[in-house]
Amino acid sequence: MKQLSRKVTSNAHGQDSSYFLGWEEYEKNPYDEIKNPNGIIQMGLAENQLCFDLIETWLAKNPDAAGLKKDGQSIFKELALFQDYHGLPEFKKALAEFMEEIRGNRVTFDPSKIVLAAGSTSANETLMFCLAEPGDAFLLPTPYYPGFDRDLKWRTGAEIVPIHCSSSNGFQITESALQQAYQQAQKLDLKVKGVLVTNPSNPLGTMLTRRELNLLVDFITSKNIHLISDEIYSGTVFGFEQFVSVMDVLKDKNLENSEVSKRVHIVYSLSKDLGLPGFRVGAIYSNDEMVVSAATKMSSFGLVSSQTQYLLSALLSDKKFTSTYLDENQKRLKIRQKKLVSGLEAAGITCLKSNAGLFCWVDMRHLLDTNTFEAELELWKKIVYDVKLNISPGSSCHCTEPGWFRVCFANMSEDTLDLAMKRLKEYVESTDSRRVISKSSHDRIKSLRKRTVSNWVFRVSWTDRVPDER
């Protein structure tokens, strides 16, 4: 062990939380309708599998893109050789336009300010390297994505200080919570370099409100720190709401070309909106030239392959396809989310009202034996091992209130979701029955004790009396 680095031998990787342990249990016993119908159903994976048919149809109609051809001629050799680390110009242009389309074309993105990365994990870590020294801190509102404990801290040496949010207001960010987190960092002698938020929120499945976004911009302005807005779920907003980006707020405040705008950075990827996590396509957007320059150099450690860029530049440049895809994706997500909510309600379980994402923030506080995180983990173990559902406990997301869970709904078929809800309902009903029996037994024992005490008091009082009083 002495021959290995401290980074290797320490447990600072952040992957020993229940979030990752649930995945491990699933992988040991994965559900399969035919091969393993009693296996664990994966509801802890935020994966969008609802619109593969649309992409596959497009690929069938555009064989050149899928076959690495141009005008029918192979360009395999051209793509196989070294390319500019900055990325293919046509892909960065198509990606910028796709990001604009998701935001209703209210804001613009300059392709020259985009840095490509191998997914948002790589993009977020790269920004940490650019903005923070080891030991510096970023403030994150809770609950937050459990992977950030690994992505932001492990290799960079940066620290996370939580902004504690409460269910009393739907876990929205408040000015007092921001100030308290900042003051806590100071007490810990940590230099705060910025705030990082996910918008839409992972794990809440809600967009940040304009009030929250304005508050964040005002806060980082007053403290002279950075704001990272991870917007990888921006294309998953469903319902009547439109996604509101931090870029919208900068425009509303006339800060688009200001010094403040240089401290606002966006992370994006195609993993959630297009359902392509295996393609490893992420991006950083920054108005700071030094950040763009440094991040571009760092991107050599996590490039996006030229073949992937070529295929996706053709896909994203097809405006008819992207328009149809975004509309249909949002419709299907809304239908699937409603199906999950209905299934939960049938089991007597509610969740935070959501309008985005691939998951719901589910309230199971009433199923806890006690209002503790120990009880939450016990419930989680029962759901994983007995009910055979892998869901993510709120404690893994640093939620301050026991009993909340993130439950994903877009990575499975409707039939599998129905089965998952059936299993959960049966578990809740059996738990309720046991509680009724337990309460009935408790009441009988309590009543028996009362009668026993009453009889004892009567006997004592009778024997204490003198003969004439009996």
UniProtKB/Swiss-Prot annotation:
Pathway: Alkene biosynthesis; ethylene biosynthesis via S-adenosyl-L-methionine; ethylene from S-adenosyl-L-methionine: step 1/2. One of its GO terms (biological process) is ethylene biosynthetic process. Induction: By cycloheximide (CHX). Disulfide bonds: none annotated. May be processed at its C-terminus. Keywords: Ethylene biosynthesis, Fruit ripening, Lyase, Pyridoxal phosphate, S-adenosyl-L-methionine. Its EC number is 4.4.1.14. It catalyses: S-adenosyl-L-methionine = 1-aminocyclopropane-1-carboxylate + S-methyl-5'-thioadenosine + H(+). The modification N6-(pyridoxal phosphate)lysine is found at K272. The keyword S-adenosyl-L-methionine applies. Substrate binds at E47, Y85. 1-aminocyclopropane-1-carboxylate synthase (ACS) enzymes catalyze the conversion of S-adenosyl-L-methionine (SAM) into 1-aminocyclopropane-1-carboxylate (ACC), a direct precursor of ethylene. Homodimer and heterodimer. In vivo, the relevance of heterodimerization with other ACS enzymes is however unsure. Interacts (via its C-terminal region) with FEI1, FEI2, ETO1 and EOL1. The stability of ACS proteins, and the regulation of such stability, play a central role in ethylene biosynthesis. This is 1-aminocyclopropane-1-carboxylate synthase 9.
